[in-house]
């Protein structure tokens, strides 16, 4: 599943949008997100693209570790400069308000060890086109 489809499912299941995060709070959003992600991890086949904060839930991490046996878990890494140009760190992203660059660095500092522990492999996606990233993943699948 792509991030867009996951997000659509989150909207369908809950009626909550990420822009509602400041109103409802991060804890509420993460609870809903975790439930949807766990459901997808249990029932979906194929590619599942998780949001960056999905791994903050211990149940999600445990399920990913369980599924890691026999599956490829890829951490698509990106530098701050590339992230900035891709997502526009100046946009209204609830967790990146008030000095978005520093907030992004703080989030990555906290999350990177989790990403690294869950990933079968890491691909630095800086300056790569989506098809190039896909080719790298396919190469990794062939060699596993």
PLM features per residue range, with description:
Residues 1-19:
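Single conserved hydrophobic/aromatic residue that forms the stacking wall/gate
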Residues 9, 20, 43, 69-72, ...:
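Glycine-rich phosphate-binding loop of ATP-dependent small-molecule kinases
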Residues 20-65, 93, 101, 105:
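ATP-dependent small-molecule kinase phosphotransfer cores
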Residues 52-55, 79-81, 128:
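Short glycine-rich anion-binding loops that position phosphate/pyrophosphate groups of nucleotides
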Residues 59-62, 85-89, 135-136:
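Short amphipathic alpha-helical segments
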Residues 66-90:
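Conserved phosphate-donor/acceptor-positioning beta-strand/loop module used by diverse small-molecule
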Residues 72, 112-144:
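NTP-dependent small-molecule kinase module
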